[in-house]
From Swiss-Prot:
Name of this chain's protein: Sulfate adenylyltransferase subunit 2
Family to which this protein belongs: Belongs to the PAPS reductase family. CysD subfamily.
Keywords (A to Z) from UniProt: ATP-binding, Nucleotide-binding, Nucleotidyltransferase, Transferase
Catalyzed chemical reaction(s): sulfate + ATP + H(+) = adenosine 5'-phosphosulfate + diphosphate
Entry's Gene Ontology molecular function annotations: ATP binding; sulfate adenylyltransferase (ATP) activity
NCBIfam families xref list: CysD (TIGR02039), PRK05253.1 (NF003587), PRK12563.1 (NF009214)
Gene name linked to the record: cysD
Known role: With CysN forms the ATP sulfurylase (ATPS) that catalyzes the adenylation of sulfate producing adenosine 5'-phosphosulfate (APS) and diphosphate, the first enzymatic step in sulfur assimilation pathway. APS synthesis involves the formation of a high-energy phosphoric-sulfuric acid anhydride bond driven by GTP hydrolysis by CysN coupled to ATP hydrolysis by CysD.
EC number per UniProt: 2.7.7.4
A biological process from GO: hydrogen sulfide biosynthetic process
Length: 309
């Protein structure tokens, strides 16, 4: 079999880089949703992926303002740096922020806080907020390289009237043809970063000069080991009597609820350092630092079936 010959670009021919192709794809998806749906929302935690999502969404509609709100499902167990970054970005860009509070659901008796982690309770709060605000599409920052359940999910991911996902009943998705059809009460989760990797995210952050919470970069803080993970000492995450606290240089690869988010030992204090570190990593960020994904082999898929991000 003869290999197909790919002609070199003609002099002066415009050619997009890998990062710009990913950016163009994501912006196309965001604009498609804005045109097709009545009440979209962007899920925004203040973490690196949702910050990149917000950056892309603002680019998609500039110089106009973002035509939909952003929503944070707030467990109440947050890193202070992440919340301050969230509030600053929302204020700087004139974006409407909807905060869906897990604490409100606990106080109202809709969920029971059995501790220590509130991460499993987010699903109820997320689905309530989608229902109350009548959102018919929700942008998420999930990527296929993060975890195997996310690897098989469509860019336009259908959710039934209960917010549930059925991985065996996913719609065909050919090239850039997306199916957003749904009935009243149903909605679509949309993942414009599906084809990005952690490396791509950091390369884009560097190329665009995007500001992140300081905890993504190396810093010294007290930590302790638990179940093979480094956890930060925090008012919501305290060591047990047999767990030794020590100080070391760490950074966070992913950020979520304090009680289930681990850090990694690192001296990478710049975007360039992190890109170099990511290039040689053999563990996904969630596999290395998220306790909520270690519940079982199918932990993420089980939660997504129930309506998780």
């Amino acid at each position: 079999m003869t290999a197909a010959h790919v002609a070199a670009p003609e002099p002066g021919q415009y050619e997009l880089s890998h990062l710009r192709l990913l950016e163009a794809e994501a912006i196309h998806i965001i604009r498609e949703v804005a045109a097709e749906f009545e009440r979209p929302v962007l899920l925004f935690s203040g973490g690196k992926d949702s910050i990149v999502m917000l950056h892309l969404a603002i680019k998609a509609f500039a110089p106009a303002r973002l035509p939909f709100p952003v929503m944070h499902v707030d467990t109440g167990h947050n890193f202070d740096e992440v919340i301050s970054t969230r509030d600053r970005l929302v204020a700087e860009n004139g974006v409407r922020l909807v905060v869906a509070s897990v604490q409100e659901d606990i106080d109202a008796g809709r969920v029971v806080d059995n501790g220590p982690s509130r991460n499993p309770l987010q699903t109820i709060t997320l689905l309530r907020a989608i229902r109350e605000n009548r959102f018919d599409a929700a942008f998420g920052g999930a990527r296929r390289d993060e975890e195997k359940a996310r690897a098989k999910e469509r860019v336009f991911s259908f959710r039934d009237e209960f917010g549930q996902w059925d991985p065996k009943a996913q719609r065909p998705e050919l090239w850039n043809i997306y199916n957003g059809r749904h009935r009243k009460g149903e909605h679509i989760r949309v993942f414009p970063l599906s084809n990005w990797t952690e490396y791509d995210i950091w390369a884009y952050i560097g190329a665009e000069g995007i500001t992140l919470p300081g905890i993504y970069y190396a810093h010294t803080r007290p930590v302790f080991q638990r179940d093979g993970m480094l956890l930060a000492v925090h008012p919501y995450m305290q060591p047990r009597d047999d767990e030794e606290v020590f100080e070391t240089s760490v950074r966070f690869r992913t950020v979520g609820d304090v009680t289930c988010t681990g850090c990694v030992e690192s001296t990478a204090s710049t975007v360039e350092d992190i890109i170099a570190e990511t290039a040689v990593s053999r563990l996904t960020e969630r596999g290395a630092t998220r306790a909520d994904d270690r519940i079982s082999e199918a932990g993420m898929e089980d939660r997504k079936r129930e309506g998780y991000f």
